[in-house]
Amino acid sequence: MPSGMFSIDNILAARPRCKESLLLPQNGPLLFSSLGESLYGPADYSGFYNRTVAPTSALQGVNGSRLGYNNYYYGQLHLQTPVGPSCCGAVQALGTQQCSCVPSATAYDGAGSVLIPPVPHQMLPYMNVGTLSRTELQLLNQLHCRRKRRHRTIFTDEQLEALENLFQETKYPDVGTREQLARRVHLREEKVEVWFKNRRAKWRRQKRSSSEESENAQKWNKSSKNSAEKRDEQAKSDLDSDS
C-alpha cells in the first residue's frame, strides 16, 4: 500500500478512545447494577433473561456471586486475553489503581474485578451475557452511557392557535377530543396531551400570580386610604388646637 494511503483500520486505530469506561481483565467479574425486576435469570448466565422475575429482595446472588457495594451484582465473564481501553493498552492486574482515561465514577473492588455502569434493563431480556464479545460489551456500555436528550416539539402558529382555541373551551379535553384535534393539526395525541398539561400548569401559575397581584393592590389601596384618613384627622386636630 502506498505511503500516502491509509486503510479504514489504520484511520480508526489512530483515534484515541479514552472515554471508554469498560475494563474487562482476564477472568474478571462483570458487575451489573441491581435493577430490581430486570436482573434475574438462569444460574450460569448462559441462557437468556426472558422470564418473569422475583422481587429485588429475592435477588441475593446469581451463580454463587455476591452482592457488592452500591447494589452491584458480580458475575464471571471469561475472556481469552486481558483487555482495556485502547489508550491504556492491555490491563494485566487491576487493583485499587484507576486508569486515567476512565471516569472517576468507575471503581474497582479488589484485584481482577471491574465495575461498569448498569446495563439498560430494556436490553437484559434479550441478552446472552456469556456470549457477548468485547466489542459488543463496549458498544452496550457506550449506548448506556449516552445522555438521553429530550426532544422538544416545535409547534407551528396554526397548531398553537388550534390548541389555544380548544384550551379556551375546555381545560381538560377528553381523549376523543384530543385525537380529533391531533388529526386536524397533524400531531400525535400524546403531544397534544403533554401540551395541555403544560398549558394548564402555566395557566395556574398565571392565575396564582394574578391573585397575588390583586391582593397586593387591595392591601395598598387599604393602606393608602388609612393614611389619607390619618392625615385628615391630623389636619382637623391641628385646626382645633389653633382655635
UniProtKB/Swiss-Prot annotation:
Spell out the Basic and acidic residues composition-biased ranges: 227-243
Query: What induces the gene encoding this protein?
Result: Induced by activin (even in the absence of protein synthesis), lithium chloride, nodal/nr-1, nodal2/nr-2 and derriere. Not affected by basic fibroblast growth factor, and repressed by retinoic acid, and by UV light.
Q: Which GO terms describe its cellular component?
A: nucleus
Q: Which residues bind DNA?
A: 148-207
- List, alphabetically, the Pfam families matched: Homeodomain
Annotated segments matching region Disordered: 201-243
Q: Quote the subcellular location field of this record.
A: Nucleus
GO MF entries: DNA-binding transcription factor activity, RNA polymerase II-specific; RNA polymerase II cis-regulatory region sequence-specific DNA binding
Q: Does the keyword Transport apply?
A: no
Show the CDD domains listed in the entry.
homeodomain (cd00086)
Instruction: Quote the biased-composition stretches of kind Polar residues, using this chain's numbering.
Output: 217-226
Query: PANTHER family, from UniProt?
Result: HOMEOBOX PROTEIN GOOSECOID, HOMEOBOX PROTEIN GOOSECOID-RELATED
Function in brief: Plays a central role in executing Spemann's organizer phenomenon (the dorsal blastopore lip of the early Xenopus laevis gastrula can organize a complete secondary body axis when transplanted to another embryo).
Q: What is this protein called?
A: Homeobox protein goosecoid isoform B
Q: What is the lineage of its organism?
A: Eukaryota, Metazoa, Chordata, Craniata, Vertebrata
Gene that encodes the chain: gsc-b
